[in-house]
Amino acid sequence: MGRFISVSFGLLVLLLSLSGTGANCLPDWSVYEGYCYKVFKERMNWADAEKFCTKQHKDGHLVSFRNSKEVDFVISLAFPMLKNDLVWIGLTDYWRDCNWEWSDGAQLDYKAWDNERHCFIYKNTDNQWTRRDCTWTFSFVCKCPA
């Protein structure tokens, strides 16, 4: 009986410790609404950052946003690490065909940008999306399904 209680308690502790850390996410990634996120301080151009994210997870991409709450969550991750830095996101017209799309194929139904260039960054300080030349280098956020 004592062993059963000890094993049960151990399993409970393990379950509770995994539940808040994104048990389905890679180590050091954060979970929100069924997706895993990680901020990377390394500076890369848009294409290299996207390629890096796809190497982290088979379904990984630069972050896409479906609503303002998701943006707020990502800012809560990125701001402590990057402060006022600009961060690549997965929105692009990389092929310059006037077809704006998320690199992960998500629907483009939430928008917050100005008009210029072909790849997007967001500003941690004011949640503005701004276009930049895709060859510039910035930190970035990767996202993948949990």
Swiss-Prot record:
Q: Which InterPro entries did the record assign?
A: C-type_lectin-like, C-type_lectin-like/link_sf, C-type_lectin/snaclec_domain, CTDL_fold
Q: Does the keyword Secreted apply?
A: yes
Residues of the C-type lectin domain: 32-143
Q: Which cysteines are joined by disulfide bonds?
A: 25-36, 53-142, 119-134
Q: Which UniProt keywords apply?
A: Disulfide bond, Hemostasis impairing toxin, Platelet aggregation activating toxin, Platelet aggregation inhibiting toxin, Secreted, Signal, Toxin
In terms of one coarse class, where is the protein primarily found? secreted
Output the Gene Ontology terms for molecular function.
toxin activity
**SMART domains attached here?**
CLECT
Tissues/organs with expression: Expressed by the venom gland.
- Give the signal sequence positions: 1-23
Kindly list the places in or outside the cell where this protein is found, as annotated in its UniProt entry: Secreted
For this record, the Gene Ontology CC terms, alphabetical, are: extracellular region
Q: Which domain of life is it from?
A: Eukaryota
Instruction: Give the family from UniProt.
Output: Belongs to the snaclec family.
According to the record's subunit comment, the protein's assembly and interactions are: Heterodimer of subunits alpha and beta; disulfide-linked.
Functional note: Binding of echicetin to glycoprotein Ibalpha (GP1BA) receptor on platelets alone results in inhibition of platelet aggregation, while binding to both GPIba receptor and IgMk promotes platelet aggregation and signal transduction.
Name it. Answer: Snaclec echicetin subunit beta
Natural source organism: Echis carinatus (Saw-scaled viper)
